[in-house]
Structure formats: C-alpha cells, structure tokens
Amino acid sequence: MADTTGRIPLWIIGTVTGILVIGLVGIFFYGSYSGLGSSL
C-alpha cells in the first residue's frame, strides 16, 4: 500500500466510480419516477 506515489490507488478509483454510478442511476430512476426522465 506504500507504492502509491504517482498513481491513484485502485480502491479510491473503485469507490469514486461506484459512488458516481450509484448517483447517476439513482438520479435517472428518480427522474423517470418523477416524470422528468422523459425530457432527458
């Protein structure tokens, strides 16, 4: 875990990617459920 100089740790990439994916999916389904998804 000490060899992270010049590179981003994979767990950080995975965590950020997971949060972004969950957020986008949540917004998409919330918009569709609210009737706003059809305009996107």
Swiss-Prot record:
Its main location: plastid. It is found in: Plastid, Chloroplast thylakoid membrane. It is a single-pass membrane protein. It comes from the Eukaryota. GO terms for cellular component: chloroplast thylakoid membrane; photosystem II reaction center. Keywords: Chloroplast, Membrane, Photosynthesis, Photosystem II, Plastid, Reaction center, Thylakoid, Transmembrane, Transmembrane helix. GO terms for biological process: photosynthesis. Pfam families: PsbJ. The chain crosses the membrane at residues 8-28. The keyword Transmembrane applies. The keyword S-adenosyl-L-methionine does not apply. PSII is composed of 1 copy each of membrane proteins PsbA, PsbB, PsbC, PsbD, PsbE, PsbF, PsbH, PsbI, PsbJ, PsbK, PsbL, PsbM, PsbT, PsbX, PsbY, PsbZ, Psb30/Ycf12, at least 3 peripheral proteins of the oxygen-evolving complex and a large number of cofactors. It forms dimeric complexes. One of the components of the core complex of photosystem II (PSII). PSII is a light-driven water:plastoquinone oxidoreductase that uses light energy to abstract electrons from H(2)O, generating O(2) and a proton gradient subsequently used for ATP formation. It consists of a core antenna complex that captures photons, and an electron transfer chain that converts photonic excitation into a charge separation. Belongs to the PsbJ family. PANTHER family: PHOTOSYSTEM II REACTION CENTER PROTEIN J. HAMAP family: PSII_PsbJ. This is Photosystem II reaction center protein J.
